[in-house]
Amino acid sequence: MKKKWWHDKVAYQIYPKSFLDTNGDGIGDLGGIISKLDYLKELGIDIIWLSPIYKSPFVDQGYDISDYYAIAEEFGTMEQFEELLAEAKKRDMYIIMDLVINHCSDQHEWFQKALADPEGEYADYFYFRKGKNGNPPSNYRSYFGGSCWEPVPGTDLYYLHMFAKEQPDLNWENPVVRKKLYEMVNWWLEKGLAGFRIDAIINIKKDLTFSDLDPDGPDGLANCWRMVENVDGVGIFLEDLKKHTFQKYDAFTVGEVFNMKEGELADFIGENGHFSTIFDFSAHILSEGEHGWYDAPPVDFKEWRKAISDSQLRVQTCGLEANIIENHDEPRGVSRFLPDYAQNPAGTKMLGTVSILLRGIPFIYQGQEIGMQNAVWNSVEEYNDINTIDQYHTARNAGLTDKEALKACSKLSRDNARTPVPVSYTHLRAHETPEHL
C-alpha cells in the first residue's frame, strides 16, 4: 500500500450546534471552533470533521441542505469559515466537511422548481412516480419510519425520500444532477477543504422498478434498504464521483457504508478504492433490534471484542478503516459498550485506548475525550432527533408503555451525542482527566 498523507492522522468530529457558542444565542458556531483549535492541536488532533454547516431548515439537524454553497447563519459566515481554514492550516491541521448528496432539503431551489412543474426539467432531478390505485408507488418504509413516498398535492404523483419527507432523494441516474454535484464538491475543495465524510452514499443507486417487497413489519411496509442492497452499479457512480472530484485534489474521503457485500472491501478502500477509508461499524450493529430500538439487545462485551478483532483481520490486506466508538448518529460509547460495573474511569480509558491503538485512522467524537455518557431524558418532547421520535412511537405501537419506550430511546438516541460539550473541560490536555471521571 502506498503511503498517503492521512495514514498517520487522528481525526476529531465536531457537531457544531453543541460544541461551543460564542455569541450567546445558544447554538455552537464557527467562532467557537476557531477558538478551540489550540486545544484540539494539543489533544493530538490532525483532521477536524465538521457535521453539516450548510444552509438548512434543520429538520434533520443539517442533513437536509437547502443551499450547498452557503453557510447556515446559525453557525456564522463564509468569511468565518475561510478564517477557520486559514487558522487550521497555520497549525498543520486539516478541515473536512460532511457531504450529503443522496438527498437534499425540500426547500432547495431544485426541488421547489420540481414541485412547481412535476413534468419539467427539474422533476428529473428527483424520483417522481405515479401512485397505484390511490396508494404510494411501492410499499417501502423510510429509515425514519412511514412510507418512502410523499404525495404531491393536486396530482397523482409521489416523490421518493429514503429519510424524512423533507429530504427528497436526488436522482443520480441523471447526468445533469451528477455534474452539478461534482461542480459543488470541487468548489469546496478549491477553497482549501481537505476532503469529505460522505453521508449515506450507498443509497444513491436504486432499484428503478420500485417493485413491492414482502412486508417486514406490522405496518405492512418493507425497509427501504432492501431497494438498494442487491442492485449493481453503485461502484460506477462512486468511481465517477472520485474521478471528477476527490482524485484531482488528493482529498481525504471517509465513506458511510453499511452492509457491504462479501469481497467488496477492496473496492471501497483498496489501493484504487472509491474512498480513502470507511467507518468500521461492525461493533455498532450488535445493538440493532429486529424491529427497532425497543427490542435491541444489550451489547455483550465479548461479542464487541470479537467484532473488532474480526474487522481488523478482514481489512489487513486491503487498506485502512476509520475506527470509531461514537459519532453524531450513535449514543455515547461508554453507555453503549461498557457494562454497568465498567462505567468508571478505568473502563472509560480502556475504551478510548482500544480505539486509538487499533490499526487504522482513529476518529474521536467531541466529548469522547472527557468520557461523556448518555443524557437523561424525561419525556419524548425533550428530544430533537426526528429518528428518536419515530422510534418512540414505534415502541408504543408495539405495546410498550411510555416509560418502557423512553427507556429504549434513552439507550440509543442520536441526541445522546448531540448534547452540549461542557466548556469547562475543553482546556484539558490529552494526559489530564476531569475530576468527575
Each model region followed by its residue ranges:
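Active-site and adjacent substrate-binding regions of carbohydrate-active enzymes
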Residues: 1-437
